[in-house]
Amino acid sequence: MPGRVDILGAGLSGLSAATILARNGYDVHVHEVRQDSGARFDGDFQGIENWTSDVDFFEEMRQWGLDPDEFKSDAFSIVDLIHPDDEITNPITDGVAFRVVERGTDEHCIDQGFKKMALDAGATIHYGTRKEPNECQIIAAGPKDSSAVAFGEIFHTDHENIVAFQLNDKLAPGAYSYLIIIDGIGLICTCLWRQQKKSGRYLNETIAWYEEHYELNRKPIKRVGGKGDFSIPDRYIHDGRHYVGEAGGLQDFMWGFGMRYAITSGVYAAHSIMGQSNYEKKVRNHLVPLIKVSAINRFLMNRLGDRGFKMVANYWMRHQARKGDGLEFMKWVYQPGIFRR
């Protein structure tokens, strides 16, 4: 008989688990220290990748019983790839390369969509409360430490919808910056993997670069920031507790596309508690290989510098010319192989 399940954290991983468990008759209680799901975000845009599986992720969500129509998303098949020497090329695919969603507490945000799914399924969410981890079966709390930081600015603009991704060691040492514009709202963000002095200046210089190369007509709204913790634990079930999402180190080390891993791990944890699968095995077989590859790729990217970034960008475009699909390069980059195990 289904019993009570306590989940620590009302983010995407915790709420995906809560939805499935509640729908299958479990008495689900989600405990969140913040006052709402998505409260740690400031309305910034993030991407859900679509290249680590041959199955479209939204279709996979539907197969699990999760409804991607509960939140706003914008699909992209093309991106501006900005080389270190300011050349701009365009990886493109016939399908969906990734989707952009908004994080936060507004009704259309993905966090609120997952909250609605969990509540509709019958889960109880306790906001503004603390719960001891040893009293929970699923640990879905966000990052506690910070091994990467991001600085961004949200602004009004009359520019068309676009996503631009930039490899430039001077603006984002060892990492990347990006521009996202959705329906008149833009976000310019620089991500830093190395510890830097006066980190704010990198954002200022990044904004200046994008203003010079894109007609943004930018009207600033606010500046935002975020952090991520990237580590690979020894195990994902400890004393009966399932560690999901960032709490379990299930994150994309290379370019920070962690939402797919978060949602997937929450689903795996729910299925494990229901007796349908073994969480430890599912994570190690399906997610850990991707995460290890992304960690090795991040290690290499952190040491390339602009000459290396230029080589990567050029190879990406040559690969697209050969394969006829820019998404194939990203699939290759994330595939475990003999040289990256």
Predicted regions and their residues:
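Beta1/beta-strand and adjacent pyrophosphate-binding region of the FAD-binding site
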Residues: 1-13
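Hydrophobic anchor at the start of a short beta-strand
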Residues: 5, 26-28, 137, 152, ...
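Glycine-rich FAD pyrophosphate-binding loop
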Residues: 10, 22-44
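Predominantly flavin-linked oxidoreductase catalytic cores and closely associated redox partners
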Residues: 10, 34, 108-220, 233, ...
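N-terminal FAD cofactor-binding segment of flavoenzymes
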Residues: 35-84, 151
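FAD/FMN-dependent oxidoreductases across multiple families
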Residues: 73, 199-278
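Active-site-proximal substrate-binding core of FAD-dependent oxidoreductases
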Residues: 233, 237, 271-309
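C-terminal auxiliary extensions adjacent to catalytic cores
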Residues: 300-341
